[in-house]
Amino acid sequence: MNKPFIDVLAGQRQSVPPIWMMRQAGRYLPEYREVRAKAGGFLDLCFNPELAAEVTLQPIRRFGFDAAIIFSDILVIPHALGRSVRFEVGEGPRLDPLDTPEKISTLSGEADLSKLEAVFEALRRVRSELPQSTALIGFCGAPWTVATYMVAGQGTPDQAPARLLAYRAPEAFQRIIDALVDSSIAYLLKQLDAGADALQIFDTWAGVLSPREFARWSVAPTRRIVEGVRKIRPDAKIIGFPRGAGALLPGYVTETGVDAVSIDWTAEPGLVRERVQSKVAVQGNLDPLALITGGAALDQAVDDVLASYAGGRHIFNLGHGITPETPIAHVEQMLARVRAYKG
């Protein structure tokens, strides 16, 4: 049976765009909150194959999305590299900062992927339970974005600690990037082996970089990951998400070799259609706040996305993750609007 999501990545436009949501397994769902409470901490949930598989499947059962994305986190790679990774309630991730060349010299260059066996087991479980027409997405964080957390030891408003280190000590910063590239290739290949149909590389903080730094720290490492995965799995379908890249999107697509690019809601439709969607599939790009709003504003926002991109190869998604306060009824409204599209 065909998977519409995979068909789009393979170059076939669909009359009704396939749809899924970033963070579709999340706190807006009461069934997720119930499992999360049972699991304990966030990483406890990520590393419990039974529970991670369950929350991955929940939005598929409820909404019938065209793709499931494995429940995990981009910071499992630093964990596999031997770094301390903790999630503090209400504060987000905490790591031991790699903020000097001396500290970076202690970084292991090779990930222990046995620490991530729970992710691969969760993928196998989900694969066995998904409908045949539903795709399964594995993922990793892009090296730049993961490095921003490793350098600062936490999330920061403008990623200044990593940007400063990359300017002041580029050779040392490159060591972090190299370790993340190699680890990500191995991690993504293992996800494919465990049943993933496609992969997404999340570069959440790509948009803070100048064009020169974007080319060095976002584009080049992503290209190395794509090439490394395809060296072993030439048919691998890979989506890039350089959030906030804007006018740099065409170059990103050309240079990285991705099959599709996910875009945020600030992307200019004309530029994307003419210089991006003419080359690869486009995924996105509903504003998550329009989804919170609902009503006529949501209908208009959905229609705008469809009018902009559904004429070409398009996967309907949000421009970033769904937020916890989003009403379920608004997700149902969005789904009905997209599935009623006649293109």
Swiss-Prot record:
Enzyme Commission number, as recorded: 4.1.1.37
Superkingdom of the organism of origin: Bacteria
BP-aspect Gene Ontology terms: protoporphyrinogen IX biosynthetic process from glutamate
GO MF annotation, one: uroporphyrinogen decarboxylase activity
Record: residues binding substrate: 23-27, 73, 149, 204, 320
Annotated site residues (Transition state stabilizer) in this chain: 73
UniProt cross-references to InterPro entries, sorted A to Z: UROD/MetE-like_sf (IPR038071), Uroporphyrinogen_deCO2ase_HemE (IPR006361), Uroporphyrinogen_deCOase (IPR000257)
UniProt record similarity statement: Belongs to the uroporphyrinogen decarboxylase family.
HAMAP family: URO_D
Subunit architecture: Homodimer.
Name of protein: Uroporphyrinogen decarboxylase
